[in-house]
Every structure is written in structure tokens, then in C-alpha cells.
Design a protein with these regions (language model features):
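Interfacial loop/beta elements and low-complexity acidic/Ser/Thr-rich segments
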Residues: 1-319
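Primarily a LysM-type cell-wall glycan-binding module
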Residues: 311-350, 355-370
Length: 370
């Protein structure tokens, strides 16, 4: 059993947006929002023929199946997912010889997802979770047909990049104020990646490989650590050794792809498009794979924001002059200066003809009162 479990909790909260007589400082952030997650399924029932009139199926030796996402499209409240599948079946015929047949088919599913939009992004993982294969008699009453029944599990995440505004500071002039705050963990400054990639992995065996009977490769799991996309590739195959014995091989290797030089966290999905192999020598196989991947890199950030503000007492500032000289430091915020003088930051900016909220050099400011 190999399980990868992601748990998401939807949190509803509120942020102070306006208050009479209060000045509110907002901070805008680009945020990766995971709008929906879920698992759907696609059932299939395929019947196909061997295409060889002189051959009947005695028994089925092994079955592999590949499944890849060929297309995906989001419209309002729905997502279309198209899947391409390939069955590889090794069987024994009536004369006792083994043979192999491959069969390709396509299927699709429309998934209902509330509140998703065409501008959203999707990360999809599709894999066969149930498969039952059996020989079946054809119209001539011969065991020359195969029926494959199964289910494909389609897990998905729907994401969007949104600009969110957070109230991070507030005050009411001439009053001592108390702010109620809360904290929220956000995925800020997201970077979107979508691309295709071909690469090669080498697998070594401790026995000689004379002939590959059947081979299968799968992407087992995907994660992002320090801006590096990691995917575990499982290779498994049946082969004949030097003594013509049927043997089984299974091994997992990790493929890593650096997405960014800045270390960030991320979400990703990998779709295996196709693969082939070359026997390098009697005990080594080079597996060549083509994938496409979807990834988001982001910075985990805990932001403290204001939910409410209240006054405690009125300040005794009756003797405060209408215009005050203030020696501002480099990189000091006009907002912080206005808050300390219980005035409006816009008055300071206009009075001193400033172009930014941050003071770029040490200077004298005229601070108007209110």
C-alpha cells in the first residue's frame, strides 16, 4: 500500500476594511488560493480481440495498465478531464506459448466543482485503482476476446492566484486605540510553472536480463522541497534470465528538477506521457521518460491582520502645534510618523511633496496637525 494524503481545512475569517474616523493601513499580497480539492472516478469496460484466428487464450499471466491525462479544461463550476490508457497483457495460448497484446482506449469525465472559473489552474493525478481482466469467448465461441473492467481515480486541486488586501495597522487621531488582531498562514508571491521534460534513469539488476517479457513505469509520488520538484519513478518488469527462468524486478528511483534558485515551498503534479527503455548491458536498463508537470512555488508567510479597532481614551494633545518640525531617518515610514503625531499621513506627504511612503534619505519634515 502506497498512500499520499493531503488534508485541507477551509477557514473563514474577517478583516477590518473601514471604520469611521480611523486610518487603516492595508498590505496587498499575491496569494495562492487552493479553492477546491477532491477525488472523482471514471469507470471503464472494454472488450477487444486478439486478432489472431489460430490463437486462443489459455490463461492470463500478467497485466499492466498506463493512464495519462491527455487534456483538461476548466469552465464555470465544471472541469473536463480526458484520459488515455494503454493495457499490456501477457497471456499463454492454447499451445503453451506466451504472447503479449497491447490495447489503447480513451475515456473522459466532467467533474462538478463549485466556484471554479476558466482562469483557475488545476493539478491532476490519475491512476487506475481497480482492474479486472478476463478472457471472453467471441462470436465463434473461441477464447479470443479479452474484457477489461476497472476504475480510474482522478484526484485534483483547483488553484487560483489572487490579490488579497490585509489591514495590518490602524489608529484614530487624538485617541488611544486598541486593535484586535488575528493571524493567518498564506502562500504568498506564487510562481506558476507548466512545461514538458524528457529525462533518463538507470536501473541495475543483480541478475542477467536476456529478454524483457513485460515492463511498466509509474510516477508514484510528487513533492516540492526547496524549489526542487521530486518525483518517485517505479520501474517493474518480468524478464527471462540466462536459465530461461521467469523473474520479476521492481525498483524505485527519484528524479529531481530544480525550478528556482530561491528556496521556496510548492505544490506540483506530474503526468507521465510515455516511456521506453534500452538494455544497456545484461544487468542494466536505461529508462527514458517524457512528462509534463504543473507546479506552484510560493513563500509560506504568517501575516497578522486587524479584525477590529476600538478607542480607550482621548489623548491630551490640546497644546500640540499646527506645524511641527521632525527629523526623519532614512527608510522611516510616513505612516509611522503620522501615527505618532496623531495626524494624517496624506497631509505630511502633501506638505513635503513626497512621492513615497518611505523616506529615502535623512531629512527634516513639516508635520501638520489635525
Amino acid at each position: 500500500l502506497n498512500a499520499q494524503i493531503n488534508v485541507f481545512c477551509k477557514r473563514c475569517t474577517h478583516c477590518l476594511s473601514s471604520c469611521e474616523n480611523a486610518f487603516i493601513k492595508n498590505r496587498e499580497k499575491n496569494v495562492l488560493n487552493i479553492k477546491a480539492t477532491g477525488v472523482s472516478s471514471v469507470d471503464f469496460d472494454e472488450v477487444f480481440s486478439l486478432g489472431k484466428n489460430d490463437s486462443q487464450i489459455k490463461n492470463i499471466i500478467n497485466t499492466y495498465i498506463d493512464c495519462s491525462v491527455s487534456d483538461k479544461k476548466i469552465i464555470k463550476d465544471k472541469m473536463l478531464v480526458k484520459l488515455d490508457c494503454e493495457l499490456s497483457i501477457v497471456y499463454c495460448n492454447e499451445s503453451g506459448k506466451s504472447d503479449k497484446i497491447k490495447y489503447n482506449f480513451s475515456t473522459s469525465r466532467i467533474i462538478d466543482i463549485a466556484n471554479c472559473l476558466e482562469t483557475d489552474y488545476s493539478i491532476i493525478d490519475a491512476r487506475v485503482c481497480q482492474l479486472y481482466v478476463k478472457p471472453k469467448v467471441n462470436n465463434d465461441n473461441k477464447l479470443c476476446d479479452i474484457e477489461a473492467v476497472g476504475r480510474i481515480a482522478v484526484s485534483y486541486k483547483i488553484c487560483s492566484i489572487e490579490k488579497e488586501s490585509f489591514s495590518v495597522d490602524s489608529y484614530i487621531p487624538h485617541f488611544k486605540t486598541i486593535s484586535q488582531t488575528d493571524k493567518l498562514s498564506i502562500k504568498s508571491n506564487p510562481i506558476y510553472y507548466y512545461d514538458s521534460k524528457s529525462f533518463e534513469l538507470t536501473f541495475e539488476n543483480d541478475k542477467s536480463i536476456v529478454e524483457i517479457v513485460d515492463l511498466n513505469a509509474q510516477i508514484l509520488k510528487v513533492n516540492v522541497v526547496s524549489s526542487t520538484l521530486n518525483c518517485a519513478v517505479l520501474l517493474r518488469f518480468f524478464y527471462l534470465d540466462e536459465g530461461s527462468q521467469l523473474c520479476y524486478y521492481e525498483k524505485e528511483e527519484i528524479y529531481s528538477l530544480k525550478l528556482n534558485d530561491i528556496e521556496m515551498n510548492g505544490e506540483a503534479g506530474v503526468n507521465l506521457l510515455n516511456y521506453d527503455f534500452v538494455i544497456n548491458n545484461t544487468s542494466k536498463i536505461n529508462l527514458r521518460l517524457s512528462i509534463d508537470y504543473t507546479a506552484f512555488l510560493y513563500q509560506e508567510e504568517n501575516i497578522e491582520y486587524i479584525t477590529d479597532i476600538s478607542t480607550e481614551e482621548m489623548l491630551d494633545d490640546s497644546n500640540t502645534p499646527q506645524l511641527t518640525l521632525y527629523f526623519a531617518k532614512k527608510n522611516e515610514s510616513v505612516w509611522d510618523i503620522a501615527k505618532s503625531f496623531s495626524t494624517d499621513s496624506k497631509l505630511i506627504i502633501d506638505e513635503n511633496e513626497l512621492t513615497s511612503d518611505i523616506i529615502d534619505t535623512r531629512r527634516v519634515l513639516l508635520v501638520p496637525g489635525m
